[in-house]
UniProtKB/Swiss-Prot annotation:
Protein's name in the database: Probable ABC transporter permease protein RC0129
Taxonomic path: Bacteria, Pseudomonadati, Pseudomonadota, Alphaproteobacteria, Rickettsiales
Keywords, in A-Z order: Cell inner membrane, Cell membrane, Membrane, Transmembrane, Transmembrane helix, Transport
GO molecular function term, any single one: phospholipid transporter activity
Family: Belongs to the MlaE permease family.
Protein's cellular compartments: Cell inner membrane
Function of the molecule: Could be part of an ABC transporter complex.
Pfam families referenced in this protein's UniProt entry, alphabetically: MlaE
Location, primary (coarse class): membrane
Source superkingdom: Bacteria
Length: 259
């Protein structure tokens, strides 16, 4: 009994160590490919549209209603302490520091991460990646580099737009439903907002973009065989990206806002 438990734990530990080592080497190869030609500009532009522009509606809807419900719930809670004037400040700080980057990251992980993993996994199953080797083309440079660099660039843009839309959602609820004065609400919104609040959110967005793209590419690149392998790669990409987004969010928050 004890031998079986020790054997199982040992196998899982070795497998985990192998996965960490494989992922580290894959990440290093992807990052180092940035400085090596060619740039594949056409692929980068295509990924800019897919990861950035096509993700904008999802991020916009998510942040708009998050800002709206945050304003509504803050009013319900703060009205008990006669602190309704702080609602706008809470909305803008919550969105720029936490909700904007995290929600955008989770939405992009679900939409883009799954698609990237499924696409590359399908290429692995159909031996298209092997065909790239025969054409003297580096698969990591051709498949991974455009997606990673594009995700790092587009995520801060998506988060910045999402923050603005989320604040707008809170503004509409505050002014038109809760009967706040428009000028007073806007003044309260920007009164305590500092550059570090926005910068920290954009840094998080860039890190989240790297996490989503590199994990999704890795999951697809090393997927199993057949349809089951593609499905597992897709699930692994979304789940692992989401978990690492939440973990890195705390670490970056700790780095920027030490208590």
């Amino acid at each position: 009994m004890l031998f079986n438990i020790a054997n199982s734990v040992g196998k899982r530990t070795v497998k985990f160590a192998q996965s960490v080592g494989s992922f580290s080497l894959f990440s290093f190869a992807a990052v180092s490919s940035i400085i090596r030609p060619p740039l594949y500009l056409s692929l980068i532009i295509r990924q800019l549209l897919f990861i950035g522009f096509h993700s904008l509606p999802v991020v916009a809807m998510t942040t708009f209603f998050s800002g709206a419900v945050l304003a509504l719930q803050s009013y319900i809670g703060f009205s008990r302490f006669s602190a309704e004037s702080s609602i706008a400040t809470v909305v803008v700080l919550s969105l720029t520091r936490e909700l904007g980057p995290v929600l955008a990251g989770l939405m992009v992980a679900g939409r883009v991460g799954a698609s990237i993993a499924a696409e590359i996994a399908t290429m692995r199953v159909t031996e298209q990646i092997d065909a790239l080797y025969t054409l003297s083309t580096d698969p990591i440079k051709y498949l991974v580099f455009p997606r990673v660099i594009t995700a790092i660039i587009t995520m801060p843009c998506l988060v910045l737009i999402g923050d603005i839309i989320g604040v707008m959602g809170g503004y509409l609820v505050g002014v038109y439903k809760l009967d706040f004065n428009s000028a007073a609400y806007l003044t309260s919104t920007f009164q305590y907002l500092e550059p570090i609040d926005v910068i920290s959110g954009l840094v998080k967005a860039g890190v989240f973009g790297f996490i989503i793209s590199i994990i999704s590419c890795y999951s697809g690149y090393y997927s199993g065989k057949g349809a089951k392998g593609v499905g597992r790669a897709t699930t692994s990409a979304v789940v692992n990206s989401s978990i690492l987004i939440l973990i890195s969010n705390y670490l970056i928050t700790e780095l920027f806002f030490k208590v």
